[in-house]
Amino acid sequence: SSLPSLAITGASGNVGGTTARLLSERGLPLRLLANTPSRAPELPGTVAVKCSYEDTLTTRGALEGVDILFMVSAPESEDRLAKHLAFVDAAAASGVRHIVYLSFMNAAPDATFTLARTHFHTEERIKASGMTYTFLRDNFYADFFVELPDEEGRILGPAGDGRVGVVAREDAGRVAAGVLADPARYENQTLDVTGPEALTLDEIAAILTRVQSR
């Protein structure tokens, strides 16, 4: 294939978009895989190709010639895991050598958090595929907490005094770009991606109040 051998999904989103922009700025040619190619960002050295999270001839064609693949997880849905597994199968069948997967902190089969279980099973499918892998286990996104306060400014949740090392989506994208620019350094590794400090929900609420009242 004459298309770039480094491919990225989710480039129209936050983390994938940051990753694509930073790699483009480094001068790396990119194949942007998108369900709607017209929504992919127009960046120097990039080409948008139609691709969805399924194992179809279209998906395999979009992945043909890809050496390194950055897989951002699919949008939340009832069949999210099935889509992930199908996409991993398509990547392996298409000859992808190294897959960098955007996973989640503490992904495990018995995790209380549903999405962490989905990410675990996706990781296991990738390992079983024989492809080289790098798992980026992002913590909760700091940007997510900005949207949580109710009309009275409260963040309600079953967290108690639990702490979370929230990370900005922008920073998660920077980590992904760093890995994709030098993938051999991170082969078959699992990296936890967190913020600089573990905070309680009360502390997060106080920070949001301080920042938003400026």
Q: Where are each of the predicted segments found?
A:
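Cofactor-binding loops of NAD(P)H-dependent oxidoreductases
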Residues: 51
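Oxidoreductase cofactor-interface core, primarily capturing Rossmann-like NAD(P)-dependent enzymes
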Residues: 1-41, 54-66, 75-85, 89-98, ...
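N-terminal beta-loop-helix "entrance" segment that forms/cooperates
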Residues: 40-48
